[in-house]
């Protein structure tokens, strides 16, 4: 996965770990083949998808992602001002969330063709983490289980952020 550092795109590295681009069609095809293999060869009740997201608005800025976005919108996303909330950044994020939803839809259909009764789920970040490019509303109809990542202590929130009666991660998702 590529991110923007200054004016250059570089491989995203988090504490020595590198991540694949969930929007890359070749990676999607490969990952779906693994999901189908698991569903076919192993006695599993379900499969949970993880890392259906990005760490920042500035991701993924690989050539394939940039070209796909530019083909649809006519400009290179590398030109977006990611540090401010603006129309182009919102357009970029909406496009990324739609692309991830399309991948979840394709994965769901492929796996369920292999094993009809398998449960599918996804780990999701809280709704206010918009920079991650997740919109569960766009893909919830393709999965059976949503697993909110509610690490309130890690992010300096109170338990009500997760368990609130009128708001909170569980209420909002």
Regions found by a protein language model. Name each.
Residues 43-44, 143:
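A structural motif
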Residues 21-22, 54, 153:
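Generic structural "secondary-structure junction" signal
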Residues 1-41:
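Active-site-adjacent "subsite" loops/lids of carbohydrate-active enzymes
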Residues 1-14, 51-83, 140:
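Aromatic- and acidic-residue-enriched segments that line the glycan-binding/catalytic groove
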Residues 31, 38, 47-50, 111, ...:
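Conserved, mostly hydrophobic/aromatic
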Residues 72-173:
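Glycoside hydrolase catalytic-domain groove-lining segments
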Residues 46-50, 119-122:
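A structural signal for short, well-ordered beta-strand segments and their strand-loop junctions
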């Amino acid at each position: 996965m590529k991110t923007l550092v200054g004016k250059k795109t570089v491989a995203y590295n988090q504490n020595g770990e590198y991540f694949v681009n969930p929007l890359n069609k070749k990676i999607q095809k490969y990952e779906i083949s693994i999901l189908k293999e698991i569903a076919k060869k192993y006695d599993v009740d379900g499969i949970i998808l993880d890392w259906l997201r990005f760490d920042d608005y500035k991701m993924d800025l690989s050539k394939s992602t940039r070209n796909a976005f530019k083909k649809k919108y006519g400009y290179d996303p590398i030109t977006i001002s990611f540090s401010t909330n603006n129309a182009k950044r919102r357009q970029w994020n909406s496009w990324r969330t739609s692309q991830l939803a399309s991948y979840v839809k394709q994965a769901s259909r492929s796996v369920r063709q292999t094993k009809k009764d398998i449960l599918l789920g996804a780990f999701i970040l809280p709704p206010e983490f918009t920079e991650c490019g997740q919109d569960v509303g766009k893909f919830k109809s393709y999965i059976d289980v949503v697993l909110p990542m509610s690490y309130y202590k890690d992010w300096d929130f109170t338990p009500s952020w997760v368990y609130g009666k009128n708001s909170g991660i569980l209420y909002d998702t």
